[in-house]
Amino acid sequence: MLKSFFLTKKWRLWAWGGFVIIIGSLLAQTWIDVKINEWYKGFYDLLQKPTENDISDFWDGIFTFLKLAIPYVIIYTLTNYFTRLYAFRWREAMTFAYMPYWKEIDAKVEGASQRIQEDCMNFAKIVESIGLQVVRAIMLLIAFTPILWGLSSNVVIPFFKDISGSLVWVSLVASLGGLIISWIVGIKLPGLEYNNQVVEAAFRKELVYGEDDRINYVQPPTILELFSGIKFNYHRLFLHYGYFDLWVILYNQIMVIVPYIIMGPGLFAGSMTLGILIQTSSAFREVHSSFSLFINNWTRITELRSIFRRLSEFEIAIGYKKIKRPKVGALRS
């Protein structure tokens, strides 16, 4: 899965060169995020005391924001385009790495067409998406943790009174607690996703055979039996996703108001300005969202685990991990 793209001569430039380009664009986005966070303080302090400032100061603030936001939008759009292209190249590398092995074996491999066509595509897309988020989360943590650490001096939190960087620790503890609960709530999802692909593959196989032979295949009793298996598994899957979604939505909504609950009393006591509150809540959101990356992507990670399991079994079945790349009938993309 990784070797076909990152360790082959044909794709090495795409894999590593593209990775460097993506890292560079993420660094630029993170730098702009930090500048926007700094902008919050001055602009919201301006809004808090409008009678003490001139309207020209307001428009200067808007213009400063636009100078940051417009490049951000352009970089973000170009990055998304390039990463989609990057994921497709990865899929292409995996597809043409598997094909010669599959053609050389005599035994039938269950769901081989789905593994090569669908699972390769989804694996590349999900790994690209989550990998991108992981790298960006690390950059945001490096950039915003010192900012939030410094801003924590403006608040006093029960149980964290004598601890430096209290807001950072609150974010970390909340994220770890949320991750543990998410793991418990979603513990059955990977197995259900795997079973779902098994029953879907059996149903799809029957339909494919039925395209050429409708006498011996796609008979009503067989279709009913296969679809009943699909329905049973989907109902279980929907149920488990239902209470997992309930937990994740509840968790995220609570975390939206946490910084305001913590800092609100200080604002009304006059120990901080509105600008500091907004800047701190923004930094808290960035740090917490980075810590909570795996919670917010749990369903995609579940799907990825299922795909990885199927592709690993497929690689073993076709001998991809056991023998050297066959030369006979090898394909070129």
Protein language model annotation of sequence segments:
Residues 1-33, 42-66, 79-83, 100, ...:
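Membrane-integrated ABC transporters
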Residues 10, 117-169, 255:
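Hydrophobic alpha-helical transmembrane segments of ABC transporter permease domains
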Residues 20-32, 36, 70-87, 173-188, ...:
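Hydrophobic alpha-helical membrane-associated segments
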Residues 25-52, 72, 139-160, 254-274:
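Juxtamembrane "helix exit" motif at the C-terminal ends of alpha-helical transmembrane segments
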Residues 33, 37-41, 95-99, 141-144, ...:
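Alpha-helical transmembrane segments of polytopic integral membrane proteins
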Residues 85-96, 100, 170-215, 272, ...:
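Cytoplasmic coupling helices
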Residues 122, 195-205, 209-254, 258, ...:
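An intracellular "coupling" helix at the cytosolic face of ABC transporter transmembrane type-1 domains
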Residues 149-176, 240-308:
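Helix-loop-helix
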